[in-house]
């Protein structure tokens, strides 16, 4: 809806741990956002793409920030399983991500695309009725299926023939404040490829681009006002054995 543009900015509690002189600003105006959204819808109607993850940037200047403290508070609030923090040469990343991009253990690969979100009304219990409502939502379900198919196709490029499976389609999981719909794609990677080959075939995560991925990224590059930087990227670890686990930023 037209109110979506300002909804984030109006959530003052999100920024209560920051001391900001000039407020939070958007890189684009509301009219520019709506105009671009309309153009992207036309791409979908013409059959150029099925969906695009269209984003815009909020920014602040002259802020007084204790990044480690902010990360601690946000992580305590969200309890996200793939949170990440670093502070290197004055560049800070504060990430409370719920989504896994790609994990490798020995020859096994797993990716867990996340599409489909609904507010969680009760934090104490897992409400099966709420979960069913999310899973039966045709928009959320179809988005998840499309991105899962994209991820399956990406992984198949570096996987042993016949090894790619969708282990779970559109499972609903409770997180703090929301339910998320997650699918799980598994495969056996080919023996003669490197970790760089694997990431090159699968990056960036389809849930952050759209489908088909290449065309979605072209449209993102055309309509988004600023480069995403590390946003939509990945943070994780590689161990000495060559295994890794990466999130979606």
Predicted regions located by residue number:
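Extended alpha-helical targeting/anchoring segments
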Residues: 1-249
């Amino acid at each position: 809806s037209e109110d979506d543009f300002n909804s984030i900015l109006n959530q003052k509690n999100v920024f209560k741990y920051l001391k900001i002189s000039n407020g939070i600003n958007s890189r684009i105006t509301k009219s520019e956002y709506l105009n671009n959204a309309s153009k992207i819808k036309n791409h979908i109607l013409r059959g150029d793409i099925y969906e695009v993850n269209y984003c815009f940037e909020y920014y602040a200047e002259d802020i007084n920030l204790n990044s480690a403290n902010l990360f601690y508070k946000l992580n305590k609030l969200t309890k996200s399983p793939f949170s990440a923090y670093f502070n290197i040469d004055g560049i800070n990343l504060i990430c409370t991500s719920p989504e896994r991009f790609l994990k490798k253990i020995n020859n096994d690969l797993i990716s867990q695309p996340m599409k489909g979100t609904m507010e969680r009304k009760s934090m104490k219990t897992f409400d099966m009725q709420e979960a069913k409502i999310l899973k039966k939502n045709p928009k959320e379900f179809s988005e998840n299926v499309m991105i899962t198919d994209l991820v399956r196709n990406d992984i198949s490029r570096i996987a042993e023939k016949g090894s790619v499976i969708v282990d779970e389609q559109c499972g609903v999981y409770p997180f703090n404040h929301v339910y998320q719909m997650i699918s799980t794609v598994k495969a056996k990677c080919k023996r003669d490829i490197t970790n760089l080959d694997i990431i090159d075939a699968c990056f960036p995560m389809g849930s952050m681009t759209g489908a088909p991925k290449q065309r979605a990224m072209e449209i993102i590059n055309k309509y988004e006002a600023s480069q995403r930087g590390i946003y939509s990227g990945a943070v994780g670890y590689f161990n000495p054995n060559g295994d890794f686990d990466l999130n979606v930023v």
